[in-house]
């Protein structure tokens, strides 16, 4: 997947803040596409007549604000998910790096997959709540916000309902990782043959293509997971799910039997359309936030220009740079005091 490159000139909290803000911004802007995708996966009536008509039906039945159903929960989930993912990924990578500090691309992708599973496990109840909020009619809501949703689901359906379908996250990670690996290996060969220096644009292209292939391969697992998250016997129309089933295997069977194999890829169009604007906004917003932090840390003259500050060692970390500046100030102060004493004599 496309990744925002870690910059040693940022503190850990600044990196997390930049990723979080960029994620919130890109999620919020592309939320209408996410809503259409999830409603298509669940199988609600909005999406029976295709991608474009889904927007019309949602707007007619629930209004414009329906395109941001569940977005607040999705944004709140981003921070614990990112923190757990980053910490787990670092620990796994540290176990597999060689003597030179390098790690193979396959191991790095597997580490990313395992970190993703760990982060998903910790934040899975929030994902279930997001799906329920999107699947419900916001004009006649059963759930009102995060805490109310968690309490109602737990009270009416038990703790297991908050983890229903999690096994599909694990199963879907396999084709997802294979897809990422295949794309990155082939793209690396392509860039090397052209003998060009790797740029941010290439990283963006790699990320979009890898996301497209990996998400397409793992999409059936994601579709069944969304149906399992949304289905509930205590909700009107069983949560809006278009097939009735008992468990994961039966869900696959019923979807194929009643809707056809291609129904496992319902919502893929919205997902593909979302990839480029999502990653474009993510990268752009991250870079803007990073430049503000670099300015505050004393590495650049101003955020818009991104001109490096003369005389500043860009290889120093933020804490090292502050210590170095403090040392220079103390040294200058000491020299001034020595000069003052010499003048008196």
Curated annotation (Swiss-Prot):
Origin superkingdom: Eukaryota
Keyword Repeat attributed: yes
One Gene Ontology term, aspect cellular component: mitochondrial inner membrane
Membrane topology term: Multi-pass membrane protein
GO biological process: transmembrane transport
Main subcellular localisation: mitochondrion
Solcar repeat boundaries on the chain: 11-100, 104-195, 199-297
Compartments, as annotated in UniProt: Mitochondrion inner membrane
Stretches that traverse the bilayer: 16-36, 67-87, 109-129, 165-185, 204-224, 261-281
InterPro entries tied to this protein: Mit_carrier, Mitochondrial_sb/sol_carrier, Mt_carrier_dom_sf
Keyword Iron: no
Entry keywords, A to Z: Membrane, Mitochondrion, Mitochondrion inner membrane, Repeat, Transmembrane, Transmembrane helix, Transport
Pfam families: Mito_carr
The family this protein is said to belong to: Belongs to the mitochondrial carrier (TC 2.A.29) family.
UniProt xrefs under PANTHER family: SOLUTE CARRIER FAMILY 25
Protein name (record): Solute carrier family 25 member 43
The species this protein was found in: Danio rerio
Gene that specifies this protein: slc25a43
